[in-house]
Amino acid sequence: MDDDLDQFFHDDAEQNADFSDDGSEDEAPDNVDVNYELEREEPKSKSVAEFTKFLQECEYPDDIIKYFKTIKFFEKDAKTGDIVSTKSLKFTVTGFIQYLFGTKRIQRPVLRGIAKIFGRYDIFHLISPELVKSITHLKETRTTAWFNLFNFLSFVPHPTDRVTKPLFRQFCVRTPFNDKSMKKRKLTWISTDYDNVWMAVMNGKISDKLTLKLIPYITQNVISKLKAPFKSADFFFKMFDKTDYHGILSLGAIFRLISEHNFEYPKFYDKVYSLTNPSLLYMSQKESILTLLDSFLSSTHLPTYITASFLKRLSRCLLLAPIDAQEPILGLIRNLVIRHPNCSELVHREVPQTLYDDPFDNDETDLHKTRALESSLWEMKLLQCHWNQSVRKRAHFVDKSIQKIESYVRFRCTDELFSVNMAKSFGGEDGEAEKYRKLQDGDEDEEGTGKPEPKKARRKGFGGKFAPKHEEKVTRAVGVNSEAPKGILDRQVPIIDVPTLWKI
């Protein structure tokens, strides 16, 4: 895959064609002294402070590339003969670390361009140990530095996604990464660098503002790529116990650790039950959270009191939920009743008659003491009077026999719901968009009230060969303009002068 940084090497593209990242990388081209680059005198370079200031003032990545062409990166160790980093390269790495952990907030587009240079696997191999040391000593109050670090790392790809091209091969022939052992284990040490940096982030003293962005990102993009995902358990369990909002964001990672890596969390369902409240349904991540709830409650071996408690809690949340969350929750409740037949008692029970007679304790956090099995899903009857037609129809499932097949849990955004309702004609039949939606959904019979519309009685004497073949012709009056024509039409032209009429 071509890298965006290649646009800065137009002049050297043909010269570096032989130095591509393939099996012949360690072979030197003809008429080139391989040792000259290592043995030549190191030119003067910027100090750590100067390079940090240089990065802060840079406008384009091309400026950094031009500076890299003027310095020497590697040299031969006089004692061992190994290829080691020069003082200029060490200053460059340290200056970049100070730039990243500075007091100035760096914009994401700038860090995206920076990552195309310092995120390449060879220079990142030299940066990662210094990053780990700096992260260890980074304080929680350094919010700006934490955000700069997170934004930079989010642009560094994992080798399973993409292996970047080497940076140093653009400037010098011999590098430590030309060694056969390094090339053979390239994917291994690239993955190790990736793991070490992210584990240092999770073990660091992270800013509270950053954790709200860090938890979803690690859950979706990092945890599945770590060599040992179970090592992230300390971070996620700590976040799970921190606050309700952190706990909700950590649900996905906690579920993966429990289901895939055999972790145990005492009273896990009690914790999830306490997090299930109406405020959860106003979050932007409510779709993924409801999907996780469905996964948590998918086992048919769950005790009935746990399922009944979640049924009642979700039913109570429905009364305060936004419109875009009501349809999915109704589908989830219906699937739970189908999945756990023992909970069908909540559907057919006639009590309570009033809210105050409901034995269910919504404030109780212990699932053993909620008394949900003694209650009923009276909230569904209340939702049958909802202003939205789709919600009304879905709430009618309690009036029908329990189905054997679970229904599809449909998520629709507020804009889609608004457009569907606006497509309906007021006081008449549904609009064309509404009719099209019904044909696409195909679930009107399943979610309806169960009362089919009565067929219209046909009048005797009509139909068959006696039916009228054509409608009666109706003559309507047409308005006539009696005023004389004006403008270009107001000309005296004989009727027989056809060419002149065409010219007009």
From Swiss-Prot:
Q: Which protein, by its recorded name, is this?
A: Uncharacterized protein T20B12.3
- For region Disordered, the annotated ranges are 431-483
In its UniProt entry, the species of origin is given as: Caenorhabditis elegans
| One Pfam entry name | CBF
Give the UniProt family note.
Belongs to the CBF/MAK21 family.
Q: Choose one Gene Ontology CC annotation of this protein and give it.
A: nucleolus
Write down the InterPro entries for this protein, in alphabetical order.
CCAAT-binding_factor, Noc4
Q: Which domain of life is it from?
A: Eukaryota
Task: Please cite one Gene Ontology biological process associated with this protein.
Answer: ribosome biogenesis
